Amino acid sequence: MIRHAGAPARGDPTGPVPVVGKGEEEEEEDGMRLCLPANPKNCLPHRRGISILEKLIKTCPVWLQLSLGQAEVARILHRVVAGMFLVRRDSSSKQLVLCVHFPSLNESSAEVLEYTIKEEKSILYLEGSALVFEDIFRLIAFYCVSRDLLPFTLRLPQAILEASSFTDLETIANLGLGFWDSSLNPPQERGKPAEPPRDRAPGFPLVSSLRPTAHDANCACEIELSVGNDRLWFVNPIFIEDCSSALPTDQPPLGNCPARPLPPTSDATSPTSRWAPRRPPPPPPVLPLQPCSPAQPPVLPALAPAPACPLPTSPPVPAPHVTPHAPGPPDHPNQPPMMTCERLPCPTAGLGPLREEAMKPGAASSPLQQVPAPPLPAKKNLPTAPPRRRVSERVSLEDQSPGMAAEGDQLSLPPQGTSDGPEDTPRESTEQGQDTEVKASDPHSMPELPRTAKQPPVPPPRKKRISRQLASTLPAPLENAELCTQAMALETPTPGPPREGQSPASQAGTQHPPAQATAHSQSSPEFKGSLASLSDSLGVSVMATDQDSYSTSSTEEELEQFSSPSVKKKPSMILGKARHRLSFASFSSMFHAFLSNNRKLYKKVVELAQDKGSYFGSLVQDYKVYSLEMMARQTSSTEMLQEIRTMMTQLKSYLLQSTELKALVDPALHSEEELEAIVESALYKCVLKPLKEAINSCLHQIHSKDGSLQQLKENQLVILATTTTDLGVTTSVPEVPMMEKILQKFTSMHKAYSPEKKISILLKTCKLIYDSMALGNPGKPYGADDFLPVLMYVLARSNLTEMLLNVEYMMELMDPALQLGEGSYYLTTTYGALEHIKSYDKITVTRQLSVEVQDSIHRWERRRTLNKARASRSSVQDFICVSYLEPEQQARTLASRADTQAQALCAQCAEKFAVERPQAHRLFVLVDGRCFQLADDALPHCIKGYLLRSEPKRDFHFVYRPLDGGGGGGGGSPPCLVVREPNFL
């Protein structure tokens, strides 16, 4: 039987929210996603460093069967264990479909669940899910370790899981579809009976265990993010808080999954609890230094520790077409179906009296329930939660009593001390489940608990993510404000009122002052990253500030935006309206009115540069991707930086001549010189800032290979052991306090991304050095011959590696048209001092720049003059993203002139993709699902610009593929229309 699953849950948006990431508040210095993934472990086998993603990519001929029909997929999956999957393409809708084996207790009623994989521009996601992915491999890899809306995690065949080398994976991949009937997929695996899963969603029937039985002490799952695309959101399993399931209780824990004692369990449950393994609650927060309660109940020492790995919390979206075997209790007909086994909440630090009081009345099924379990060890800092497409996932808890809702919420309390847990963010909830969680932390509300102690337990709602917890900091719909007001009205005043910015758990278990907690919550990166995504989902403007998806704001700007005091809510609708008026968006709009005209235009240019809907915005994004690819293959630091500077100059020339900028500029307010300076500063922020770390890394690598850094370090030690007289110093040198100020200036200069800002800091540093020189003989003028030895003395006591990178960065990346004046003099002097240190010789000490250094400076000045002249008459080099065979597959960003024809671009594609028969390949454009072939003399850049400017916005992809098939319609599709002009639609 085949069932379709994955429809959107009630209250969820019917379609995906466009990828968010343009708010400067959410900047996390990801640059072009160059951050290396962390390496936490989970419980999936991982041998010799082969990640799940690599295994999926290598074995895609086995599980990615686009041409298979529904019946054939069902035939294959009915013979394998639960959790096995295949991906096919629906012949009618042309959409990918994830087919998962889903048997019940009765093998004859086994099903194949089908989840539609939606595609929107550059993202993929399961229908009904909030998580978006870059490609099918990352999507499948994520669902192999976390189920989200699936009833359980996906399972790879045992042969793939146990493969220890790429040779083994190639052997499996060569079998293709025949793998499922081969000896590598043994009969005992295909036919072994299903057993209850260790990790399933409430309301789903039991299926076979998805966790492999192989033991491995080095289990891991990494998904490495690739560079070279303009996507902003990715889901990485190693960044998911609930990324793995529990191991079977009869197996010892893996080497990197520490054994943790489980809370006491109860046998007085329904008959289904005999075979339904219970999910342990998350560990409690760390015990505070001074307990909130002086009397703690004794801890039973006879609890046997059992292995347990972190479990994903249950999603509130059940599969709509699967009939559960364990219906919900009759007195709660609106609840999601669940297993009736009772779940004992894990004791939380600081809530000892609360839990003890809750366990006294009611039908306690076991004596162990009256005594809390020993506290579990605190977990490490949890990684960042994955991005979400929608604001909130509504959970229908209105029919439940407050006591049971509080018990359900206690099951999902995160451990205290995590840097990104919900307790570190403002808790202004709009969900009913969160209202009852606030009540659970209030001792005065506990007399309500005994009335519901005997009712069947309620499955815990999915823990609300950061992006949903911040909903109340923005203008919210009226119904959300009413819910929030009701929650505050229900709360009973306590001697110590809860502080904003902390969850109830942290309010009871921590002793931090309110100011510290508020500052911590505002400075957390999740607060910054979630604000823009939440606002975009609500359709509300967060701020009228720079919307920079690539972390292009300064540190000072970020601190200013989050330094405003938090507004304390009161249980009244008036305060809900006040919160709307006093939101960040309103504050930002008010301050925006006081900005100067130049500053306003600067912010508009920055917004335009990262608006992918504009032609200039797409040009900037493609340029950054191209620059990263270019830097990876450069061997000369000067050539690398010069190419970056040339591209920036061309981008500026294009924007100054484009109609996009003319629509933003008032000619009466801005002169041509001011306009050029504003655009240059905006490009520093939109281009250089996200590329800064990559540039420094490439420069460091290049200079390490040519021996420059090693030579600098060796001579630095020699100069440190040399007296000031031997260095040629005839004046005073900076004292220790002044030297500390100078080194602080150097540190600030290294952190800056703008070449002009770096030069400004360098000038201030040189002034400090001159002031130190004049201390010994005030009033005496000193020249360059006196300054150079002292500068060498100062540089030898600084970080020479950073100084070398900074000087080269400033010399090659600043605007060729910029008249530096004094800045140019001190920059070249610093360069000369570094060259003197690099080639330092005690015998030939000189107080002047050597001839070689002077020649090098003259070459640099000529290069600047030539670049300035070339920029005035050069054509803008454009970029175009082309995929191979299928849209968004093996995408490459190609650089070419705007007047390049399709035939020349095809030659570039043939070289880039290394095709064997380039004459049989052509360039196609897919527009809203329709395929068109570009004529040889067509201009792809003109077509790209036309499609970007068209209204309504169109989804288009350039694809390089053979003429006889592939891409949009498959081999049997009719021939595509050949187009030449941009307005072919």
Curated annotation (Swiss-Prot):
GO terms for molecular function: GTPase activator activity; guanyl-nucleotide exchange factor activity; small GTPase binding. It is found in: Cytoplasm; Cytoplasmic vesicle; Early endosome. Coiled coil: none annotated. One of its GO terms (biological process) is regulation of vesicle size. The keyword Glycoprotein does not apply. Residues 278-288, 315-336 have a biased composition (Pro residues). Residues 587-732 are annotated as: Interaction with RAB5B. PROSITE patterns: RA, SH2, VPS9. GO terms for cellular component: axon; cytoplasm; cytoplasmic vesicle; cytosol; dendrite; early endosome; endocytic vesicle; neuronal cell body. Widely expressed. Residues 703-846 form the VPS9 domain. Residues 63-158 form the SH2 domain. Residues 1-24, 183-202, 251-293, 315-531 are annotated as: Disordered. The keyword Cytoplasm applies. Keywords: Cytoplasm, Cytoplasmic vesicle, Endosome, GTPase activation, SH2 domain. Ras effector protein that functions as a guanine nucleotide exchange (GEF) for RAB5B and RAB31, by exchanging bound GDP for free GTP. Required for normal RAB31 function. Belongs to the RIN (Ras interaction/interference) family. This is Ras and Rab interactor 3.
